[in-house]
Amino acid sequence: MSVVSSFHQSWKSLILASQRCNTVKQIKSTHSLFIIHGLHRNTYAISKLLTAFLHLPNLNKHFHYASSIFDSIEIPNSFVYDTMIRICSRSSQPHLGLRYFLLMVKEEEEDIAPSYLTFHFLIVACLKACFFSVGKQIHCWVVKNGVFLSDSHVQTGVLRIYVEDKLLLDARKVFDEIPQPDVVKWDVLMNGYVRCGLGSEGLEVFREMLVKGLEPDEFSVTTALTACAQVGALAQGKWIHEFVKKKSWIESDVFVGTALVDMYAKCGCIETAVEVFKKLTRRNVFSWAALIGGYAAYGYAKKAMTCLERLEREDGIKPDSVVLLGVLAACAHGGFLEEGRSMLENMEARYEITPKHEHYSCIVDLMCRAGRLDDALNLIEKMPMKPLASVWGALLNGCRTHKNVELGELAVKNLLDLEKGNVEEEEAALVQLSNIYFSVQRNPEASKVRGMIEQRGVRKTPGWSVLEVDGNVTKFVSGDVSHPNLLQIHTVIHLLSVDALQIL
């Protein structure tokens, strides 16, 4: 064997060894051999060594080492740049991916240019760093360079930029520019609507996807069920349930099963929610939280508290803050004052969970329901953190129920300080205070507060409700005149009113 052939064989073995590294110790050993054999100047070999960092479980700890290897390369190639941007996107410093991208585009070498992989990794880094404005600039870049229409991963990444920034109109425009979007892209768009509380729009996207002939995956189904839960679309939820049965996803996917439990519970079918829960072959803390939340909403406090014992006993699951919040809410609805107080006081000792504002809000609500407003105020004053609006809001609701003007004024004062600039929340607090004044016949003060509302330019948010008929969810808003079938609706209401008067 010639000397050259021997060198080539050694280099090949070292490069293969670098691809098998899964600990930093192995990477360092291989790097040392690279230096000994002169491979540390070979960009192909170094790119393979850098790729090994992606397999490390504690990448953040060794990010500086990866960066130093990159800095030792005299002229990195495109693959090395791509690898470093990818490492940044996986680390706790994703913003540095932009630095490597800028270094890359400054290179004067003709063969060093961003590819679709570069943009894909860069978009992932921007998403992790919440650099949405940069992501939009990348969108312009990929459109200008023709990458957007040619790569599916880049299309999905750009769509996610707008969805994560909650710019849903722009997200829809981007989506409509994608030729033949796959299920993943439909999922991203639908999830964007649902996360913003626009369940009806999310279901419309789901129906569009079905009309296009695409079959939903587990993620689509989970998101669609969440949308059904938001708007109370029980009929559509049942249809999805039948689809899930055919796919056997209740048994195989815990998130689909959990979404079904949550949907039935929020649509008023707690018994069906329990039946679905019993069929889950695997249950996690979210499954139990959905069931406990359902029990809490319908006042089944004892069943919710029993679930807290069962999840540890049956599944060996440690409750999280959401589960405990559900149990506290159940105690509030059921009037179990002592049990709720005991749980709050022992959360940290028993469950190693520090109570948050929402937990205190539940107990304040519970105390107010029991008429213990002074105790509720005492609890607020002893909180280890500054009370937020949710806590004072719970006290204000109790003051309205029990017509307590003094504490109501205190609660509103704190709410206005906390919600300064939030017009809707300011209006809600002032309306509550005026109602308290009216309830105790203090009409001058009530009128004064109403005047404050008008001076602030606060406009009351109209009430609304949704109704599902034949799978279509319609939103009815108080005072709305924009519905396309307004004339027919008013005609039917008039006829029903006439019939009702005749019956009376």
Curated annotation (Swiss-Prot):
Pfam families attached to this UniProt entry: E_motif (PF20431), PPR (PF01535), PPR_1 (PF12854), PPR_2 (PF13041)
PPR repeat start-end pairs: 77-107, 115-149, 151-181, 182-216, 217-251, 253-287, 288-319, 320-350, 356-390
Region spans: Type E motif: 391-470
UniProt keyword annotations, A-Z: Repeat
Entry keyword Chloroplast: no
InterPro entries, sorted: E_motif, Pentatricopeptide_rpt, PPR_At4g14850-like_plant, TPR-like_helical_dom_sf
Gene3D superfamilies according to UniProt: Tetratricopeptide repeat domain
Taxonomic superkingdom: Eukaryota
PANTHER family recorded: PENTATRICOPEPTIDE REPEAT-CONTAINING PROTEIN, TETRATRICOPEPTIDE-LIKE HELICAL DOMAIN SUPERFAMILY
Protein name from the UniProt record: Putative pentatricopeptide repeat-containing protein At3g28640
Native species: Arabidopsis thaliana (Mouse-ear cress)
Lineage of the species this protein comes from: Eukaryota, Viridiplantae, Streptophyta, Embryophyta, Tracheophyta
Gene: PCMP-E79
